[in-house]
Amino acid sequence: MMNIDDIEKQKESNLAKGVLTGYGVIAMCEVTNPSPLFYGVGGAHISSQDGASIRLEGSGAIHLSSSITEQGQGTEAIMKQIAADQLGVSMDSVRVTLGDTDATPYGGGTWASRGAGIGGEAVLKAARTLKENILDIAAAIMQTDKNSLDVENNTVIRKNGGEGITLQQLAETVYYRGCLLYTSPSPRDNK
């Protein structure tokens, strides 16, 4: 914030030297995360959509891929925080791949401040979907109702206490010992 008293003193000092000085204040609101119509009017033919893909790897770690790129505005950290928060895991267990057009979902790109707003929403939705899938599989493994489970500190826990299962154990079962699950291809079919 500016210090008006200092500015007034500077004005007086300048006036004594025959220099007229003034100051002004401006307020503005910059548009961010607009629709494709907004971009199109300006001649920028880009999409206002972005994609995110999140998967539980065989090690129990999380891999997040997004079409957004990091340009120094902290988008990678923001996306990692969103994923970790939604999944109930530590940020250290989330690996992020941004902007690799061979490996990430299609999207409109960062374009300055839209990265966290639009790309972050895609990460939020993808993380919520993955968590539901994790809880479905955990419910099948633990032979309990999925609504009695949650994920905290990289572990699927029973809300009322009792033994849980780490995401590493869950991932090892899914990737390497699927025969231990129910006979149906989807735990949702076994309810």
What kind of region is each of these model predictions?
Residues 1-54:
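Accessory "access/gating" subregions that flank catalytic or transport cores
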Residues 36-39, 75-77, 105-110, 161:
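Short acidic, glycine/serine/threonine-rich loops at helix termini
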Residues 1-4, 107-141, 169-178:
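Glycine-rich and small/hydrophobic secondary-structure elements
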Residues 156-158, 165-174:
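Polar, glycine-rich mid-to-C-terminal structural blocks
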Residues 9-14, 19-25, 65-67, 91-100, ...:
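Beta-strand segments within the central parallel beta-sheet cores of soluble alpha/beta enzyme folds
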Residues 61-91, 117-142:
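Alpha-helical support elements that line or immediately flank enzyme active sites
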Residues 28-33, 59-61, 68-71, 101, ...:
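Short, glycine-/Ser/Thr-/acidic-enriched flexible segments
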Residues 182-187:
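Conserved small/polar residues in nucleotide/adenosyl-binding loops
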